[in-house]
């Protein structure tokens, strides 16, 4: 039997044990993390089904969020995965982007342990989405391989993130006046198709500077450099209302390398080649003609090929002006040769006419001498020189005559001269390099006639008697040889009337027109200097000019 003192002690021990057990259970409950409970709930598919069913219960996707109330704000941003190519002929560009849109739909708010509902594209068709379209897009494609490339997420507060992968071909108006030193601002415009700004507006998610991202590895273009992008927004009015339009400008600057190799350097080399013809002799007509025609055809081919990479614009570009000036230089080189050839022929014709008049004047000289006999020379010095030469001729003949019977030969030989009182130097005729020239023909006649009159007046040595010198004597032929023979030939060609025959007065050869024309000499300096000055002005103007198109800033 338990004593009365032990009963209270046992009851107290049970109470303490119960209190301790309760404290331990409470501590265990407090130490249990809420994440584990949330994880357990996430692992249950019934939670997702319950939340989605509750969201779509009574939801009408035909009505925008806040219908009849405040304006729906759609925030957008763009991530460019690939930019290009850019077509100058079609004036368009193509790019691949991730196009993101964010808005708040309070009808999709939910309570639960799940912070974000990550859903597939099947949910997109069951909720309201903005009717965004690209205003300047020519063709836009939403990728569907292997499934539609769409991302759809619903946050607990009703915020919705909708992302699509798109390939967009958009129009890029280009002003090609400065081609190929030009730059362009290619726009991408998008907005709501049906909702005016009184119901829906667009804004940039990260602000104007960071809402459009273009990585460097995504903008590797062949003919352009993507130097940056800017954003703006504008309001467009139409008969259905005013609409907000968001615009992104991609700034492109053209690369010059291709056009330098393909057009500019060949044009410069062709012009230089056309100017080489100025250093070719003007008589080389085939060579200079080939130079001119070949360079003109080459410039024509270059101008045609340069236009293939451009649209058929009605104005001239910077490259068109350069090609036109190069073509003008090449064509001018061909015209220059035509001018040289023309003036050379004119000069040769004038020289021929002067040459044809000279023999007529010479043939008229003997006729004047018959009417007006020549008087003795008035110049005493020339007369004395003539007499000395004739005296030397007589003395030489006399020395030879002492050993040879001159009398026998003189009866058989004809004398060189006829009796006359005219005095003209005979030795001048014999020493002349061309005794049959027009200038010496008249002097030859006078010299042949003047020999007998000169001999008697010439003082002689003692024991010698002056006498006529027969041309045909052997001693004379031995001593003077060819000179007297030329005199004899000239005298025999003279007729009884004293006129020169046509055969004794051969006309001088006509001028050949060889040498360098003055036009060529001027062209050798003028053409290169002018072309160099043109290139200097051309490149300084266009390389220092700001040719980048300006985008409109309407923020």
Curated annotation (Swiss-Prot):
It comes from Bos taurus. Residues 422-435 have a biased composition (Polar residues). InterPro entries: GABAA/Glycine_rcpt, GABAAa_rcpt, GABBAa4_rcpt, Gabra-1-6_TM, Neur_chan_lig-bd, Neur_chan_lig-bd_sf, Neur_channel, Neuro-gated_channel_TM_sf. The keyword Phosphoprotein does not apply. Residues 410-421 have a biased composition (Low complexity). The keyword Transmembrane applies. Residues 36-259, 306-318, 546-555 are extracellular. This is Gamma-aminobutyric acid receptor subunit alpha-4. The chain crosses the membrane at residues 260-280, 285-305, 319-341, 519-545. GO terms for biological process: central nervous system development; chloride transmembrane transport; gamma-aminobutyric acid signaling pathway; inhibitory synapse assembly; synaptic transmission, GABAergic. Glycans are attached at residues 47, 144, 157. It catalyses: chloride(in) = chloride(out). It is found in: Cell membrane; Postsynaptic cell membrane. Belongs to the ligand-gated ion channel (TC 1.A.9) family. Gamma-aminobutyric acid receptor (TC 1.A.9.5) subfamily. GABRA4 sub-subfamily.
